[in-house]
Curated annotation (Swiss-Prot):
GO terms for cellular component: ribonucleoprotein complex; ribosome. GO terms for biological process: translation. Coiled coil: none annotated. SMART domains: Ribosomal_S10. This is Small ribosomal subunit protein uS10. GO terms for molecular function: structural constituent of ribosome; tRNA binding.
């Protein structure tokens, strides 16, 4: 029989919130009896936007804003039905985007 595993990918703009959410997932799944690999930090994506400060002229005066997207990867190996049930009931922050692949 093929080994069942779940790959959970987390994305957030705040690294503190994503770390707290990853810790919640790891604690919940290990208490349910599944083996876990991670959380593995993936490269942070940085997007920079350049905006002209003045509404009319002075094009040389610009302001730069950046937005960083932090990512974490968690692999759940040796999956149990209890672990899947615990993951479904888990309440995470709305600031964290969760992608789950089987």
């Amino acid at each position: 029989m093929e080994e069942q595993k779940i790959r959970i990918r987390l994305k957030s703009y705040s690294h503190e919130i994503i770390d707290v959410s990853a810790k919640k997932i790891v604690d919940t799944v290990t208490r349910a009896g599944a083996t876990i690999v991670g959380p593995v930090p993936l490269p942070t994506k940085k997007s920079v936007v350049c905006v002209i400060r003045s509404p009319h002229r002075h094009k040389d005066s610009r302001e730069h804003f950046e937005m960083r997207t932090h990512k974490r990867l968690i692999n759940v190996v040796d999956l149990t039905p209890r672990a899947v049930d615990a993951l479904m009931r888990l309440d995470l922050s709305s600031e964290v985007n969760v992608e789950i692949k089987l």
